[in-house]
Amino acid sequence: AALAAGDIAAVLYEPVMTNIGMVLPEAGYLGALREITRRHGTLLIIDETHTLSSGPAGYAGEHALQPDFWVCGKAIAGGVPCAVYGFTSEIEARMRAVLASREAGHSGMGTTLAGNALTLAALEAALLHLHTSATHAPMQAGARRLAMPLQALFAARGLPWHVSRVGARVEFGFAPAPRNGSEAEAAMRPVLEQALHLWLLNRGLIVTPFHNMMLIAPMQTNDAIDALVSEIGAFLDEVSL
C-alpha cells in the first residue's frame, strides 16, 4: 500500500536483520518484496555489509533476489573501511539516458576515504582470495559443523533455543527463532550471555562480545569448532541448563 502512490523511488533493505541477533526473513518475504517493487516501479537496493558471509555473490546471489542496486561496506574488503556499489545494465541505460539529455560537464568525488591505497589493496586481496567459491567452501562447511551440533546440544537438554546460519555466519539465541526485532530483543538474557562469554574466555575461546555470533574464518580448524561446541555444552552442564 505504501508504494501504490508511486512517490517512493527506492526501497533500501538488509536481507537479514543482524544488529539485534540474527532474524532471518520468512519464506517468500523477499520474493514478494521484489515483485511488489517491480509492480510499482520502485527500485530495490540491497545492503550486503552484514550478509556477504552467504557466499561469493552474497545473499542476493545465493537466493536470486535480483536487486536493482547492490551495495556493501567493509566486509567486502575484509573489514577495512570500504564501500562499493553496483547496478544492473537496465539502471545503467537509464542513467546514461539522463546524462545524454544534460549539458556536458564534469563531476567528481573527493573525500577522506576516497582513493585510499590501503582500502584498495585490501579490497583487491579480498576479491582475489576471500570472496571465491574455493575459499567459501571450507567456511560454509565449518559453519554447518558448528550449527548442527549446537542445535542438537540444545535439543538434548530440552532447551527451546534456536541456531541461525547465514552462510559462514552462525548465531544462537535463548528462545525459539524470532520473527522480528521485538521478539529478538525480548528473548535476550544479558546475564546468561555474559556468563557464557566469560566461561569461554577463561578457556581460550572468544565469540563476538555482543549477541552469540560466530563467523567461520577460512583458516578455522575443525578442532577449534569442536572445542567451542564442547565448552558450550560444559557451560550448560555447569549452570544446570
Task: Walk through the language-model features, giving the residues of each.
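Conserved N-terminal phosphate-binding loop of PLP-dependent enzymes in the Aspartate aminotransferase
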Residues: A1-L241
